[in-house]
Amino acid sequence: MPCFTVGLNTAKCLSSALGVPLYEFSHQAGHVAAAVYSSGHIELFDREFIAFHVSGGTTEALLVRPDEEKLLNIDIIGRTLDLNAGQAVDRVGVAMGLKFPAGAELEKLALKSQKVFKPKPCVKGTDCCLSGIENKCLDMIKSGEEQCDIALYCLDSVAAALEKMTKNILGKYGNLPLVFAGGVMSNSIIRQRFTKEFGAYFAEPAFSADNAAGTAYLTYLREQKNA
């Protein structure tokens, strides 16, 4: 992406001008490292684990292994085949008249609902399709259903898809530790559900959408290795 190229070139210029080392890490590595660091479980850097990055721009499941050179070796093992989770949440929220990004306001509404939903997620192996969530919620809006119920259905449906993906991934790769990152995973409804069911680790809300802190921590680890 062009924005990453600009950042990389700026870093190269600063490295050259200051005479300091330049360490390159992927966008995903930054998010994963921020999540692991803020969860308080830095021991995961020394073992294999599963990480989910769930946001408006990404909905991916990652197999993460220690790597001598890159520190983290990351392979995508599951993903959305259409909408990202954050896109579905924001589109539904905006359609309801909420401000973009809509995640926080949608959560507040959902917590007021007394309904119990049992969504049927569209999951194919370790991949998911989330566009049906938006379509169903738009139908609910047109039908005049309560906004709090629509909000809860949306978030429950996202959680159900991620839950099914998680079960399929654990069945395929074994009972590995789980780490969740990305703005969508700062949602308290989803966090409580996954903590209870899987014992998953989460980035602190302030770090959920942050990868700069993760990149800084990876740089620290690299410096420690080189010392």
Feature annotation, model-predicted:
Residues F25-F49, L218:
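Conserved phosphate-binding catalytic cores of ATP/NTP-utilizing and phosphoryl-transfer enzymes
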Residues A33, A51-H53, T59-L63:
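Short beta-strand scaffold segments in enzyme catalytic cores
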Residues H31-A35, A203-A227:
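Glycine-rich phosphate-binding/hydrolytic loop that grips phosphoryl groups
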